Regions:
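Helix-coil boundary/capping segments in enzymes
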Residues: 1-263
């Protein structure tokens, strides 16, 4: 049976490693420029790093972690490589973050539009909450400009800080006023306050007033230290971790339901 309905890809991503290399350093406030991610030389090519020691991966690399592409390791990446994605990336052709080139790749896959999640994971790896908030502001501005090129094909989800409710509210209100984005994503970290906590109340109200759906993206549970394990134990632990990766969101759903947020 052939599907004749338009395909909307509801879980797509913009990864930091495919963003313009000077995006954050050029657009950050003067007091925070030295704390922003930037691109420098690495042994396998240009890499994204920060001065406090955070590592984000190879520029235009594979997946959100910016890994080096290894043929035969991940079938989805093999398909992307077959279309020249990673070779183009080495040449500085950012197909994933150039709106016209991304639309061409959508057409190649028969996709009519994408919901685009952002850089919350990378912001957490920065381990600098104030700088991460600035990083998200810059990204959200870039995202709005990106989606504005073809709003019928891109539904951008703004990244919202989760470490401080004042920062979260401020950025939510800013992106709502800015327009273009279609929703906001709140961090779903294991150490954040449960969603039924009163601290979240103002955020829910602000999102509702702005007409912006609130999104959560799974990050899985606590990650085991695979490198400290024997090879077979590591394989088993990884299989358990990756199989249960999506189940972590059941906790968030229960917090929403029993917090009365859906009533």
């Amino acid at each position: 049976m052939v599907c004749t309905e338009p395909i909307i890809s509801a879980d797509c991503h913009i990864d930091l490693i495919w963003l313009p290399p000077a995006l954050f350093t050029e657009n950050a406030r003067a007091s925070l420029k030295d704390r922003m991610p930037f691109v420098t030389d690495g042994k396998d090519g240009p890499i994204w790093v920060s001065r406090n020691g955070a590592f984000f991966g190879l520029q235009n690399g594979m997946g959100s972690a910016g890994r080096k592409y290894v043929p035969g390791e991940i079938h989805r990446s093999d398909r992307m490589a077959a279309q020249g994605l990673y070779e183009d990336g080495k040449k500085g052709i950012r197909r994933l973050t150039d709106p016209q080139l991304r639309i061409k790749d959508q057409d190649l896959d028969g996709v009519r539009g994408e919901v685009l999640y952002g850089i919350l994971g990378a912001a957490a790896r920065l381990e600098d909450p104030v700088a991460a908030s600035e990083m998200m502001r810059i990204y959200n501005e870039w995202l709005a400009d990106f989606c504005a090129h073809c709003p019928g094909r891109f539904a951008g989800i703004a990244s919202i800080p989760g470490h401080d409710m004042g920062s979260a509210l401020s950025e939510l209100e800013r992106v709502a006023k800015r327009g273009v984005v279609k929703g906001v994503e709140i961090p779903s970290t294991t150490d954040s306050k449960p969603l039924y906590h009163d601290d979240w109340t103002h955020l829910w109200s602000a999102a509702s007033d702005a007409g912006l759906p609130v999104h959560f993206h799974t990050i899985g549970g606590p990650k085991p230290d695979f490198e400290s394990m024997a090879p077979q134990e590591s394989r088993k632990a990884f299989a358990v971790f990756i199989t249960g990766f999506q189940l972590h969101m059941a906790q968030k759903l229960m917090e929403l339901i029993y917090g009365g947020l859906l009533e």
